Amino acid sequence: MSEIPGDLKFLKSHEWARVESDGRVTVGISDHAQGLLGDLVYVELPGVGDTVQVGNGAAVVESVKAASDVYSPVSGTVVEVNSALSDKPETINEDAYGEGWIFVVEIDDKEQLNDLLDPDDYAELLEDDDH
């Protein structure tokens, strides 16, 4: 398993959130999640301007094995999507924490970030899943 970046926060459902310098939040799925799904073949992105709610489905990733909702770790408005994933969904498999980001949210309430798991807690969750 790859190293979990220290600047990310996580949902228990394996989505990550990274607060950018402008206060917006970039969202993707964890390296663990992409590994469970296998080779991704399709990503259904939210629309720019869509309102997303914390814990609700905002996107869908599909692999040859399964389709999985991508839940938003924060509430707000989608301000950017990674349209490159339409042509190359496997980017998530190759770089889940970098080029494989899925969408960016203008967050409504920064306090929501405090409810997310930090990298150590997320690593602990993964260890518990393995037992």
Swiss-Prot record:
CDD domains the UniProt entry points to: GCS_H
Keyword Disulfide bond included in the entry's annotation: no
Cited Gene3D superfamilies: 2.40.50.100
PTM sites of type N6-lipoyllysine: 65
Span of domain Lipoyl-binding: 24-106
Keywords for this protein: Lipoyl
InterPro entries (alphabetical): 2-oxoA_DH_lipoyl-BS, Biotin_lipoyl, GCV_H, GCV_H/Fam206, GCV_H_sub, Single_hybrid_motif
Cofactor: record remark: Binds 1 lipoyl cofactor covalently.
Cellular-component GO terms for this entry: cytosol; glycine cleavage complex
GO biological process: glycine decarboxylation via glycine cleavage system
Pfam family, one: GCV_H
CC cofactor: (R)-lipoate
Role according to the record: The glycine cleavage system catalyzes the degradation of glycine. The H protein shuttles the methylamine group of glycine from the P protein to the T protein.
Subunit structure: The glycine cleavage system is composed of four proteins: P, T, L and H.
Family of the protein in this entry: Belongs to the GcvH family.
PANTHER family reported in the protein's UniProt record: GLYCINE CLEAVAGE SYSTEM H PROTEIN, GLYCINE CLEAVAGE SYSTEM H PROTEIN-RELATED
Protein name: Glycine cleavage system H protein
Organism: Xanthomonas euvesicatoria pv. vesicatoria (strain 85-10) (Xanthomonas campestris pv. vesicatoria)
